Amino acid sequence: MSGSVAVTRAIAVPGLLLLLIIATALSLLIGAKSLPASVVLEALSGTCQSADCTIVLDARLPRTLAGLLAGGALGLAGALMQTLTRNPLADPGLLGVNAGASFAIVLGAALFGYSSAQEQLAMAFAGALVASLIVAFTGSQGGGQLSPVRLTLAGVALAAVLEGLTSGIALLNPDVYDQLRFWQAGSLDIRNLHTLKVVLIPVLIAGATALLLSRALNSLSLGSDTATALGSRVARTQLIGLLAITVLCGSATAVVGPIAFIGLMMPHMARWLVGADYRWSLPVTLLATPALLLFADIIGRVIVPGELRVSAVSAFIGAPVLIFLVRRKTRGGA
C-alpha cells in the first residue's frame, strides 16, 4: 500500500464523518426560510412551540433523516452491484431492482389504492424481490454462480420493460400520476417520521450485511475463478449481496423514489480516495453518499423551493466529478 493511500485512509473516514455532520446541520438550518441554530436546537430538545419549530420537526428533520437513510442505502447498493456485475458503470437501477420497486408501488396505487408507508414498502420489497429473482434466474450459470454479463443484460432489459409499464400505468391513471409524479422524479420531501421508521430496521440489517461482506467482495472483485481458488464461497456471496441490494434499493425507492446516479458515482469516488479494498471503500461510500444527497437537497431547496428535485441536482453536481475521476483513472492507466 502506497504512503499516499495510507495517509488518505487515515483522514478519509473522520473527514467524511465531519462533512456528513455539517451537511446534516445545514439541512436543518437552510431552506426557503433560514432558521437560527437556537431554534433548531430548541425544536430538537422539545422546548420550543413556535411555528419555526414546526418547520424543523415536520419538514426538515424528516427529509434530513430520509437523505441519510436513502443515501447510505443507495451508495452501498451501488458498490455491491458494481462488484457482482464486475461492471464499473453499474448502479442500483442496472439490475432492474429500482424499476421493480417503482413498478410495484405504482401498480399497488393504481389497482388497490395503496398510499401508506407500510403498503408502499411492502409493494416496493415485493417488486424489488421479484425483479431480483428474475434477473438472478436469467443471469445464473453452472454451479449456482451468476454470470456478470448475463446479469447485466437481463437487468437492463427488465428495467426497460418495467419502466415503460410504470409510465404507462401512471399516464393512464390521473390520480396515480398526480400522487406519484414528484415521487418518481426522486425527492426527499418526507412529511413524517413514520415512513422512515418502517424502513429503518431493514436498511440497518442490509447495510450491516454489506459491510460484513467486504472481505468476500475483495476476493470476488478478482473474478469468480480466483475467488473460488482463494476459498471464497462465490455463489453464497453473490446471493447474499443480491438480497442486500434488493432490501437497500427497495427501502430507498419506497421512501424517496428512484434516485439515480449517486449509486454509480460515489463508489468510484470512494475507491479513488482509499483504494479498491472494500474494507475501506464501503465505509467511505456509506459516509459520502448521504452527504452528497443532503447537499444536493439543500441546493434544490434554496434555488427553487419545492420544485427542483434532489435527483436532478445530485446528477448536476456529480456528473463533473465522475468525469474527473474517469479521466484521472484513464490517465493513470495510460
Question: Predicted regions: what is each one?
Answer:
Residues 1-334:
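Alpha-helical transmembrane segments in inner-membrane proteins
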